């Protein structure tokens, strides 16, 4: 399913080429106009503190479905508890967050579904651990896996939220046939760092880029510090597309 090194070898083309991702807390029509191919929003939010905003739950999924209907864009949201899987029937892509990357029982159950799975790298996960988590899903029957680099925990925490490991993009693309997405928002934790790292991810060959958005970042209930405005996103997306055009030309 992934490579000879990991006991599988599937040489199919990536099933989701050319992805570009929008975040949440924004006008979805603006994001679509800027070039986003998917909308992602957190209905269930994994937070370090139990006192922080935990998401809207089932109501959040309903709002995502409204955005899907309005724009025609497929939606992505995170599953935190396998017992909530029935609520995700109309969700197009299920995200497995960094905290659940090695929740093997969940991965096995997701392997029994037919939905694409966006699998984030663990907080301090190695490349091999990420690939083994992908194998859990694929060995259970679901080969629609998308790998996501979202930054790993290192000794640096003063100036960045995590450390974005861009080398993982060519490494994973060399080892696997699976699409590789980069999340510079969670990796850096700061809006002013998102654009340069998104551009670097595009240059490294990422198949998709996930960017957090909000109409009013200072007043966002979560992740405001790393969120771009829709206008900033449109500017950044334009640069990303030009990089990809230059690489393809």
Language model features with spans:
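Glycine-enriched alpha-helix->loop->beta-strand junction motifs that scaffold or abut catalytic
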Residues: 35, 87-95, 111-117, 138-144, ...
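Hydrophobic faces of well-ordered beta-strands that scaffold small-molecule active sites
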Residues: 12-20, 37-41, 75-77, 94-96, ...
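N-terminal amphipathic alpha-helix/helix-capping segment at the start of soluble metabolic enzymes
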Residues: 1-26, 238, 245-249
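Conserved anion-binding
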Residues: 43, 47, 100-167
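Alpha-helix-loop-beta-strand connector modules within alpha/beta enzyme cores
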Residues: 53-77, 109-116, 166-181, 226-249
């Amino acid at each position: 399913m992934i490579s000879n090194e990991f006991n599988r070898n599937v040489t199919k083309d990536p099933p989701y080429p050319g992805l570009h991702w929008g975040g949440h807390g924004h006008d979805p029509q603006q994001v679509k106009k800027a070039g986003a191919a998917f909308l992602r929003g957190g209905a269930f939010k994994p937070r370090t503190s139990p006192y922080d905003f935990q998401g809207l739950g089932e109501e959040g999924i309903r709002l995502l479905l409204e955005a899907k209907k309005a724009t025609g864009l497929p939606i992505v949201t995170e599953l935190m508890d396998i017992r909530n899987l029935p609520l995700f029937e109309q969700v197009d892509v299920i995200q497995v967050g960094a905290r659940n990357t090695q929740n093997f029982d969940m991965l096995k159950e997701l392997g029994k579904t037919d939905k694409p799975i966006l699998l984030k790298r663990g907080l301090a996960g190695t490349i091999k651990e990420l690939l083994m988590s992908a194998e859990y899903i694929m060995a259970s029957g679901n080969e629609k896996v998308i790998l996501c680099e979202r930054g790993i925990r290192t000794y640096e925490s003063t100036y960045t939220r995590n450390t974005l490991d861009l080398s993982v993009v060519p490494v994973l693309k060399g080892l696997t046939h699976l699409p590789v997405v980069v999340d510079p928002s969670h990796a850096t934790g700061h809006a002013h760092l998102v654009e340069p790292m998104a551009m670097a991810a595009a240059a490294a060959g990422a198949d998709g880029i996930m960017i957090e958005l909000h109409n009013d970042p200072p007043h966002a209930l979560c992740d405001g510090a790393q969120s771009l405005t829709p206008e900033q996103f449109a500017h950044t997306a334009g640069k990303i597309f030009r990089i990809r055009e230059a690489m393809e030309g």
